[in-house]
Amino acid sequence: MLGPQIWASMRQGLSRGLSRNVKGKKVDIAGIYPPVTTPFTATAEVDYGKLEENLNRLATFPFRGFVVQGSTGEFPFLTSLERLEVVSRVRQAIPKDKFLIAGSGCESTQATVEMTVSMAQVGADVAMVVTPCYYRGRMSSAALIHHYTKVADVSPIPVVLYSVPANTGLELPVDAVVTLSQHPNIIGLKDSGGDVTRIGLIVHKTSKQDFQVLAGSAGFLLASYAVGAVGGICGLANVLGAQVCQLERLCLTGQWEAAQELQHRLIEPNTAVTRRFGIPGLKKTMDWFGYYGGPCRAPLQELSPTEEEALRLDFSNNGWL
């Protein structure tokens, strides 16, 4: 049974054609997006009140939109109903002119199709689909092209590919990205791998398509802009939103020396809340910066005192605390 909040959002989505975007029409997704965390109570329930509080503060920054139910949102630990409810609540909380990109990836193609359609119905403007990875040994380019094509064929909203090899152990091959860029309902890629050469190559090889690449981390945002990326989905923007948006402005206006200086000061904090300490580190930092971070869902554990001190140093040594 779907909850009343979700049914209400579905009715609203159906009344507006499921999305502000028209299927098959390319949309401009350039800009900075924070991948929103999922707040939990002490009993591991989703805390929708704290979610709204965080969103209200994040909405004061010049983000292009918000990414919900990505890796930072702990989506593998949420039920399907919770994933939809979170997206529904975010849609209601954020300004109407902000894009809502929702993670809809599942392991099977059928489940991904169903989740993508449901995400559109509760208010998502764009679906972000992570690579299926449990059977990664059989996830060839052909298998992945088939998967994404089936999803994009049915999806009522545009699709963004999502490659995050640090979590999946699988990098979406360049040849697959190039092929998929030709699909009229696939508009871009979030690449979290950190290989700027790869990002530049993808931008180059998809230049004849209306295809956009978003950097998946603030740590290589400047370099990504330099090779043709149009924005970033950056976990660090949850705590240093103004600074990440400033880096975007510096890059877009060609102020490369100032951009380089700022980028240097973001690298260590970014690494700390991504690869080094992950979501527990990001949530702890959110608590320090006046947001609600709170606990993660098990099996993710809180930081040890030693880890917490190291995290604090990564921010204080760069002038952020």
Swiss-Prot record:
Entries under SMART domains matching the protein: DHDPS
Reactions listed under catalytic activity: (4S)-4-hydroxy-2-oxoglutarate = glyoxylate + pyruvate; (4R)-4-hydroxy-2-oxoglutarate = glyoxylate + pyruvate
Keywords for this protein: Lyase, Mitochondrion, Schiff base, Transit peptide
Binding site for substrate: S71, T72, S192, G216
Broad class of enzyme this protein falls into: lyase
Function: Catalyzes the final step in the metabolic pathway of hydroxyproline.
Pfam families (alphabetical): DHDPS (PF00701)
Name by which UniProt lists this protein: 4-hydroxy-2-oxoglutarate aldolase, mitochondrial
Gene3D superfamilies referenced in this protein's UniProt entry, alphabetically: Aldolase class I
Residue range covered by the transit peptide: 1-23
Active-site residue list: K190
Cellular component annotations (GO), alphabetically ordered: mitochondrion
Activity regulation, free text: Inhibited by divalent cations.
Gene name of this polypeptide: Hoga1
An example Gene Ontology molecular-function term: (4S)-4-hydroxy-2-oxoglutarate aldolase activity
Site feature Involved in proton transfer during cleavage, where: Y162
SUPFAM superfamilies: Aldolase
GO biological process: 4-hydroxyproline catabolic process; glyoxylate catabolic process; oxalate metabolic process; pyruvate biosynthetic process
Family listed: Belongs to the DapA family.
SUBUNIT field: Homotetramer.
EC number: 4.1.3.16
Subcellular location: Mitochondrion
Species classification: Eukaryota, Metazoa, Chordata, Craniata, Vertebrata
